[in-house]
């Protein structure tokens, strides 16, 4: 595959203009064991997960993790079982207590809060959606959705109105008086989404919410998350073991292994420039033309473009640009805004497509 004249930089920190991150994580550790706090900062902390467990009986869940999530971003954390991804999302709200490190939500230090402030933050600023729906079987849909508002102390009329709005938002109008056991798995997860949204949180966190659903229902729920994000614009942290799900949902993806960050990047960065063999294996089956943008396949502009050459943006997906490029009589101009950054022709496009077919 032809690369650009200037290989795109990896997005190790959040995009943006210096605004306060929605989520800021710095130097986060979680070690399970009775002397966990004594290990941080010692030579033992440099041992591999296996070596540390063999020598001390302690297990590293998360090792020195740092990242930012921008306001409004869908940030996906993925990895295989045991990679630490579910531990990480629980550390963000201190459902599991960190051994060391800092977590902030919109500038507020979660790791420094007392129990009262932490409880208030969980009630008002963060909502979580888990794989297991956790619906109350004796409550109707609308009352399940309103439950968090009830715990928060809001009046019955106010919380019922808000709950009905969220029921309608997630496409369950007409089911508000049904009980959970009268709903399909996908519908129950929609109730979970509505309940999470009802509190109007600043950050939504998802821990593999769709992994137990049938493939078609899972796809529908992924599309529902995309639609809801477009409508409400919430910051989302999404945990998954499924690369296809990560590529579909994520603005950026953090890949974990053995409690450590392996790579952070946009979907096209992860597929186009995998950090190591672990990531390369993850992405080997991905149809690259569906993920890579033109900046990954374009060549330097040599100055011989036709005046009427088609113009394409550098962040356009190869698959979406293919018809225009293949129908053009010569190379197409690739721009970043108004600046020409390269050219692309049919050979560049076909090189990606042929590589997929020969995989």
Which residues does each PLM region occupy?
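The conserved cystathionine-beta-synthase
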Residues: 307-330, 334-339, 344-359
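A short, proline-enriched helix->beta-strand linker immediately N-terminal to the Walker B motif
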Residues: 198-202
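Conserved ABC ATPase "signature" region
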Residues: 24, 41-51, 108-109, 150, ...
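Helix-to-loop junction immediately C-terminal to a conserved catalytic motif
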Residues: 93
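Conserved ABC ATPase signature
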Residues: 179-183, 187
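ABC ATPase "signature
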Residues: 264-265, 273, 343
